[in-house]
Amino acid sequence: MKEGIHPNYREVVFQDMSSDFKFITRSTIQTKEMITLDGKEYPLAKIEVSSESHPFYTGQQKVLDTAGRVEKFRNKFGSKIGKAAK
């Protein structure tokens, strides 16, 4: 590998802004902010969604009623489309 062309791979704290959940992982992300966690200073990357706040992982997801939407569409436009094609 060539020297000086690879990004710095280091430990970084990712903070979920919606739930204030923080976790440490390794990344090459460039950040300007720093945070102290467990007595050690790390670069800080702020994110909007993590497994702590995403509806799929928290069990708070909504199920869309697509069958009702399709039936509503067919009731409104179904007969018009069939007549126009003839």
UniProtKB/Swiss-Prot annotation:
GO BP terms? translation
List, alphabetically, the GO terms of the cellular component aspect: ribonucleoprotein complex; ribosome
Asked if Ribosomal protein is a keyword of the record, the answer is yes
**GO MF term list:** structural constituent of ribosome
Which UniProt keyword terms apply here?
Ribonucleoprotein, Ribosomal protein
Offer one Pfam family short name for this entry. Ribosomal_L31
UniProt protein name? Large ribosomal subunit protein bL31B
As recorded in UniProt, coiled-coil segments are none
- What gene name is given for the protein in this entry? rpmE2
Annotated transmembrane regions: none
Q: Which family does it belong to?
A: Belongs to the bacterial ribosomal protein bL31 family. Type B subfamily.
Subunit organization: Part of the 50S ribosomal subunit.
